[in-house]
Structures are given as C-alpha cells and as structure tokens.
C-alpha cells in the first residue's frame, strides 16, 4: 500500500475513478449531473498535476492505482474573515472493486496529516446531501457540518 503524488501516467485511472463519482452524482441528481462526460480534459489534468496549490494523490495497492485524492489549498480573506489556510478535498474516490478495505479512511487520514504538515487550520470538503453513504463516511472520520447550502428548485 502506497499513497503518492499522482503522475501523468495515472491519468487514465484518474479518469475512470472520476467517472465512478459522476455516476454516483448523476444517480442522485440527474437534474444537475450528466450521465457521461469528463470533469477534466487530459490537458487540464496535466496542468493540475503540475499545480502545487492543487495536489493530487493516488492510493496504490499491489502496484495498481485504486483510489485518488484531489486537494486544493484555499485561504480566506476579507474584512470580516480571519486569514485561514484550508486544505479542501475536491474528490476522494476508491475503486468499487476494493471498497470495504479501509482505503477511503487511509486517504482521509493522509489528507488530514498532509493538511497539518502544510500548516492548515482545517480540512474541508463538499458532500451532496443525497449521498448518505458519503455523509456517514465523513462523519465517522470526525467531520462536522460547517454550513448548509439550501436550494428550492423552481422549474
């Protein structure tokens, strides 16, 4: 088991895992998410891999990439906000073939340790309210709601 920075050679597997996430989101919210498509083009993924503010990590099991962790450093600013450095988890995904082996927990713990090493105040992420499994997973990791985004569908 290894968690390491993603490399350009990982792009095909990253895209497969991103497709898994898209399907989960499409099933929960087909009014928002398309049934197919790419979140990032190959060129965009290459650029992300080179961006130190948006690190991407992969989980290798027996030489195969079976999970990923897309992160982003964010800093709050403004007249009423304290300047806080945050590590935001944009995507955390584990291949369905290896779920239940605590790989998600290991990726999350890695993100938490990485955030501490980088001097972050907190670790944050967004999770869709309809994704009850993900909500439970993150609550088990110790996360608590920071705020709620509400919606009323008009059409």
Predicted segments, located by residue:
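Conserved beta-strand-loop-alpha-helix junction that forms the acyl-donor binding cleft
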Residues: 124-134, 151-155
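Conserved GNAT-fold acetyl-CoA-binding loop/helix
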Residues: 22-45
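Conserved beta-strand in the GNAT
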Residues: 58, 64-73, 88, 93
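A short helix-loop-beta-strand connector motif used in the catalytic cores of GNAT acetyltransferases and
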Residues: 43-58, 88
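Conserved acetyl-CoA-binding loop-helix of GNAT-fold acetyltransferases
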Residues: 91-94, 100-113, 140
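Conserved active-site alpha-helix within GNAT-family acetyltransferase domains
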Residues: 105, 109, 117, 129-147
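Conserved GNAT acetyl-CoA-binding A-motif
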Residues: 115-126
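A short beta-loop-alpha structural element at the N-terminal edge
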Residues: 2-16, 25
């Amino acid at each position: 088991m290894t968690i390491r920075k993603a490399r350009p050679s990982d792009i095909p597997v990253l895209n497969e895992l991103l497709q898994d996430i898209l399907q989960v989101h499409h099933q929960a919210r087909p009014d928002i998410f398309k049934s197919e498509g790419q979140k990032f083009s190959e060129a965009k993924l290459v650029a992300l891999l080179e961006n130190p503010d948006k690190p991407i990590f992969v989980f290798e099991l027996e030489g195969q990439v079976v999970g990923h962790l897309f992160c982003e450093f964010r800093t709050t600013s403004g007249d009423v906000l304290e300047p806080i450095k945050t590590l935001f988890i944009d995507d955390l995904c584990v291949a369905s073939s290896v779920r239940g082996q605590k790989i998600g927990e290991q990726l999350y713990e890695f993100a938490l340790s990485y955030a501490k090493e980088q001097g972050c105040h907190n670790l944050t992420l967004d999770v869709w309210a309809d994704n009850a499994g993900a909500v439970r997973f993150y609550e088990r990791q110790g996360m608590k709601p920071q705020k709620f985004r509400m919606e009323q569908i008009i059409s």
